[in-house]
A protein has these predicted regions:
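Short aromatic/hydrophobic "clamp" motif used to bind/position activated sugar donors
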Residues: 12
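A generic secondary-structure signal
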Residues: 2, 28-32, 157-161
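Catalytic core of nucleotide-sugar-dependent glycosyltransferases
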Residues: 127-134, 141-169
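Active-site catalytic microenvironments for nucleophilic, acid-base chemistry
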Residues: 6, 116-117, 161
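Glycine-rich, basic loop-to-helix element that forms the pyrophosphate-binding segment
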Residues: 1-7
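Donor-binding/catalytic cores of nucleotide-activated saccharide
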Residues: 17-124, 131-148
Length: 171
C-alpha cells in the first residue's frame, strides 16, 4: 500500500522479489499503453527457482485459466495474485483498492476487488512473467494453523463479495 501511494505512472504492474520478467515483457506491455481497458491479464510461466527450465507444479492450474472458454472470467474471479496483470492506476485510486494488512494472503482480496470492479478487461496469452517456486515458497510450504486460518478467511471474504455481486465464480 505504501508503494501504491507513491506510484505515479498510468499503469501498475507487480512482481515478487524472487520472480522475473521475460525479455520481451516491456515490449508487450508497451502495446497496451493506450488501451481503454482497466486491467490486462497476461499469461505467466511457473518454474523452479533452482532450474528455470523446469516447470513447477503450480503452472498447470494458472495456465488452465487461459484454456477456458471464457478466460476473462476465470482470471477476474479466480486469480488471487497481483502479478501477471497490468492495472490502470486511476482505476485502483477510484475504487480505493488496496492490499489487506495481513502477513500472508494480503493480495487475495485485492485481486478479487480488481476482478469485480474493472469494467473493461482483456487477456493476452503471451507469457510476460516467470513465477519461481522453491521448497521455501510460501505457496508450497507447509502452513501453520494461523496461516491456514488467514488464507481461509481471505478466501471467504472474496466469496462473500462475489456472492453479494451475484458472480458465481467461487474460490
Amino acid at each position: 500500500n505504501i508503494g501504491l501511494s507513491h506510484a505515479r505512472g498510468k499503469w501498475i504492474i507487480f512482481a515478487d522479489a524472487d520472480d522475473f520478467f521475460t525479455a520481451d515483457c516491456f515490449t508487450i506491455l508497451n502495446e497496451y499503453m493506450d488501451s481503454p481497458h482497466k486491467v490486462i491479464y497476461f499469461n505467466v510461466r511457473f518454474v523452479m527457482s533452482d532450474d528455470p527450465s523446469q516447470e513447477s507444479r503450480r503452472g498447470t492450474y494458472y495456465t488452465n485459466f487461459f484454456n477456458d472458454v471464457n478466460p476473462e472470467n476465470k482470471l477476474r474471479y479466480q486469480s488471487q495474485v497481483p502479478w501477471g496483470k497490468m492495472i490502470r492506476r486511476s482505476f485502483l485510486s477510484t475504487f480505493h483498492i488496496q492490499f489487506d494488512e495481513t502477513r500472508i494472503a494480503n493480495d487475495v482480496y485485492f485481486s478479487c476487488l480488481v476482478g469485480i470492479y474493472a469494467p473493461k478487461v482483456t487477456t493476452d496469452r503471451r507469457i510476460i512473467y516467470y513465477c519461481t517456486e522453491s521448497g521455501q515458497s510460501l505457496a508450497m510450504s507447509k502452513q501453520d494453523r494461523e496461516s491456514l486460518i488467514i488464507r481461509f478467511n481471505a478466501s471467504m471474504k472474496c466469496n462473500r463479495l462475489l456472492r453479494q455481486e451475484k458472480i458465481h465464480y467461487y474460490l
